[in-house]
Amino acid sequence: MRFGVDEAGKGPVLGSMFAAAVRADPAALPGGVGDSKDIRPERRERLAKEIRESADAVGIAEISVERIDADETDMNTLTVEGQAEALSAVARDGLSGTVDAGDTDAARFGRRVADAVDTDVAVTAEHGADETDSLVGAASIIAKVARDTHVAELAAEYGDVGSGYPSDPTTRTFLADYVDRHGELPACARRSWSTCDDVLAAASQSTLSDF
């Protein structure tokens, strides 16, 4: 029995980031588990259901927009916290496993995650672990499905918000239109992102040009 941990939604300008941990016998996992970004959404959902059924335990942690925008933190620290919170939900003394490294220094990232978990676990951090470790790949799928569900909930509240990523024209249009109508950013926006600064600056310039 081992564990794998990964996160989804680190880079978007909209919504929460999610981390997931899966404790299981790798041999019990369904076939086709890998990096969630390479799997179509419908198949991700089916695999997530099968992973939950075959795993010994699954843990999920949500890192909210409010935590992301807090002055005293950064995304590396929040990724450590999210992975540690998800891992804490499935960890047992003496357990070992792999986490996807969210820092350029993989060893340092692994130490930080291990230090943030109360249970005595052995953590190995690797870059691209979601592509090489089936348990990390399984955690990647669970985290991505949680993030997809979250984005669908935002769309139900606000209308089409796109993927939530700064590079998505639909997301940028949503932000610009929302600010134009309401004079402020939506509550789901990560206000500390430069994308939000750009949208607010463009709205301010547009207002000035009206005079």
UniProtKB/Swiss-Prot annotation:
Which cell locations does it reside in? Cytoplasm
For molecular function, the Gene Ontology terms on record are: manganese ion binding; RNA binding; RNA-DNA hybrid ribonuclease activity
**Which GO biological process annotations does it have?**
DNA replication, removal of RNA primer; mismatch repair
Q: Which keywords are on file for this protein?
A: Cytoplasm, Endonuclease, Hydrolase, Manganese, Metal-binding, Nuclease
Q: What is its EC number?
A: 3.1.26.4
What cofactors does this protein use?
A: Mn(2+); Mg(2+)
**Pfam families hit by this protein:** RNase_HII
Q: What is its main location?
A: cytoplasm
Residue positions annotated to bind a divalent metal cation are: 6-7, 100
Q: Write down what this protein is called.
A: Ribonuclease HII
Q: Which organism is it from?
A: Haloarcula marismortui (strain ATCC 43049 / DSM 3752 / JCM 8966 / VKM B-1809)
Gene name for this UniProt entry = rnhB
